[in-house]
Swiss-Prot record:
Keywords: Cytoplasm, Queuosine biosynthesis, S-adenosyl-L-methionine, Transferase. It catalyses: 7-aminomethyl-7-carbaguanosine(34) in tRNA + S-adenosyl-L-methionine = epoxyqueuosine(34) in tRNA + adenine + L-methionine + 2 H(+). This is S-adenosylmethionine:tRNA ribosyltransferase-isomerase. The lineage of its organism: Bacteria, Pseudomonadati, Pseudomonadota, Gammaproteobacteria, Lysobacterales. Its EC number is 2.4.99.17. Transfers and isomerizes the ribose moiety from AdoMet to the 7-aminomethyl group of 7-deazaguanine (preQ1-tRNA) to give epoxyqueuosine (oQ-tRNA). GO terms for biological process: queuosine biosynthetic process; tRNA wobble guanine modification. One of its GO terms (molecular function) is S-adenosylmethionine:tRNA ribosyltransferase-isomerase activity. Pathway: tRNA modification; tRNA-queuosine biosynthesis. Pfam families: Queuosine_synth. It is found in: Cytoplasm.
Length: 347
């Protein structure tokens, strides 16, 4: 049985990107073809030459909300609030960071004005009701702070409001960016269109749970967090058309893979709107995509396990070793890979 430790690798701290490059598509791109072909060191801007006319790139069009708030308990202790998802106009599921857990009925006095009351708790998540001057989503857009990942050791600035967002983001609701999409700028998208590559979109609202570690030794015991997603009829038809013409379906990011796999019914992609808790790790056969663009993921993370299921665990760990040796930049603001699937029987 696979263990969490089977997905460990050593990463020097200085390779964790603390901010974006000046140009989105200037990030490096490691080409990881199916074995035994060698890895190639490229750039994201090389994608038009690496893809083929008729290929379909599938993006996640979720938009990150400024979901981080600060306040204090009535007793005076500081509280950090991270919105996970909205429930109506004035309620939200949140994560709280505070010295002591809050209980149902407790109030939080918000630094930006107004207050929030604790209505309930489920594990790491709290249900809060907000007494603020406008609907919560609108109010957050004015006063909220962008929630950068915990491995970025600085406060967010105005530049992050632009760069920790894809250029095609439109469906408001994520608290973390679908980071593979951050590499695509308008110039690159135009060159891909000119190459004959088509674009399709799903929506998956990335939750704060994406940063939660696997806390069990055996993978089969892990329970994934739930995230809302939508695969529309238009995208389903685009996928069918791409397959019919011999094009490849290429996921831009693990969120796209999780959405497409969650919408598979009897071996066919179907329109779907709802929640997914799908946990993809080696042993699972990914059938919805032919290739994947993805960033480099944390050791022992569920995202690393997903890409290992697609490309092979040994192959991925070898690629990560190569990335460390070649000084690639890691995680959300880091570099990317173009992955192709493992061969049958490859571990």
């Amino acid at each position: 049985m696979l263990k969490k430790s089977d997905f460990h690798y050593d990463l020097p701290e200085e390779l964790i990107a603390q901010g974006p490059l000046p140009e989105r598509s200037a990030s490096r791109l490691m080409l990881v073809p199916s074995a035994p072909e060698q890895f190639q060191d490229c750039y994201v801007r090389d994608l038009p030459e690496l893809l083929q006319p008729g290929d379909l790139l599938v993006f996640n069009d979720t938009r990150v909300i400024p979901a981080r708030l600060f306040g204090r308990k009535v007793s005076g202790g500081r509280v950090e609030i991270l919105i996970e998802r909205f429930l109506g106009t004035h309620q939200a599921v949140v994560q709280l960071r505070t010295s002591r857990s809050l209980k149902v009925g407790n109030r939080i006095l918000l630094d930006a004005g107004g207050h929030a009351g604790v209505l309930g708790r489920d594990g790491d998540f709290y249900l809060l009701s907000f007494d603020v001057e406008s609907p919560l989503e609108q109010w957050l857009s004015d006063v909220g702070q962008l929630p950068l990942p915990p491995y970025i050791h600085r406060e967010p600035d105005e530049y992050d409001r632009e760069r920790y967002q894809t250029v095609f983001a439109r469906a408001v609701g994520a608290v973390a960016a679908p980071t593979a999409g951050l590499h695509f700028d308008e110039s690159l998208l135009a060159r891909l269109r000119a190459r004959g590559v088509e674009f399709g979109y799903i929506t998956l609202h990335v939750g704060a749970g994406t940063f939660q570690p696997v806390r069990v030794a055996l993978l089969q015991q892990h329970v994934m967090h739930s995230e809302w997603f939508k695969v529309g009829a238009e995208l389903v038809e685009q996928v069918r058309s791409a397959r019919a013409r011999g094009g490849r379906v290429i996921a831009v990011g693990t969120t796209v893979v999780r959405s497409l796999e969650s919408a598979m019914r009897h071996g066919e992609l179907q329109p779907f709107v709802g929640e997914t808790q799908i946990f993809i790790f080696p042993g699972y056969c990914i059938r919805s995509v032919d290739a994947m663009v993805t960033n480099f993921h944390l050791p022992e993370s569920t995202l690393l396990m997903l890409v290992a299921a697609f490309a092979g665990r040994t192959r991925i760990l070898d690629a990560y070793y190569h990335a460390v040796q070649q000084r690639y930049r890691f995680f959300s603001y880091g570099d990317a890979m173009l992955l192709f699937p493992r061969n049958a029987g490859e571990q």
